[in-house]
Amino acid sequence: MAEDGKCRKSGLELLRIIAVILIVAHHEVAHSDINVFDQTFCVKHLFFQLLYLAPGKIGIALFLLISVWFLADKPATIKGAFRKIWLLWRELLFWNLAALVARLVLDPNGETSYAMGHAWLDLFFPLTRNEWWYVTSYAIFLLLLPFVLLNLKNMGKALHGECCLIMLFMWAVLGLVPGAGNDIGLNVVGFIYIFVLISYYRWYLPRISKRAAWIILAVGMSVIVVANVFLSLIIHDATLLIEYVSPWEKEWSIPILLISFGLFELFRSIKWQSRVVNYLATSALGIYLFTEQPFFREQLWTKCVVLSDFYDAKYAIFYALISIMLICVIAGALDLLRSFLFRLTLDRHRGAWFNALWNMLLSKFSFLTHF
């Protein structure tokens, strides 16, 4: 089957579902009222400590790898970028509007004029206000992609490879130093970094074998587990422990990319097709948008699922896993409902409003024909 993105590969669609589950698992601990690094070290403590960073960073890397794999071999235009951003903005508008209504219903007298002023700004300008950092970075990346793609292709294999090595040295090797930032993180720089690496692999290198993918995955997982166990045993200050663990688990770190790339290659090699998986995977982004919308996020992790309520329970790990899956199921169902409403209304002529607006601008600004 051609990997043109037109026919969804169920292996990668299943990986999207796994990615968003990992992100929700990370948020359950990261947004909780417990500092898991300050708890007595045991198997349960290790489990929650491992959830604190790594799963979420693996999840966003998987989301990005799946997207850029197909974008690397597609023509990129400014018009195409704006169209994708337009379609994405409608979903952001929906979730922000739903959150605004929920806030007014749950606490009609509790909203100050200051809070409501920000709520309206968030409603219409979610990208510029960075409500969802991943979506904002992705939108910026799409706008830059035509220029990045053209220049990478013009570089050729040798110069592209040198660029990869420089990036790996700056952000993979030096990134292991505790406290290092190097201007990369939850921003578009990470997106460009991953695109440069994955495009080089797609254009110039042979595909790795399943055995190699398993080895890469195992190495990445082993490094993270060993780092957490070893550092927890020798460092007893919670703040210092976080500082030394983070370089191994933060976004775009070597272990995170090893795990993500290994999983990506393993699931990409899956040949089977499933309409059910493909359908459910359409809600993966929606699950992320719902659970990370600021108001819904606060409700989820401070009122609905409070880690401190069951952390000391005998079956805390089981409760955590059940709550993660339950949140994903509910959020996924809500997004499928949103998708159904869109099909009845906005998507009856998908992109028609954008095309009309673009054509109107085209009639007034002729230079847009080059985009």
What do the PLM-derived regions correspond to, one by one?
Residues 1-371:
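Alpha-helical transmembrane segments and their immediate juxtamembrane cytosolic regions
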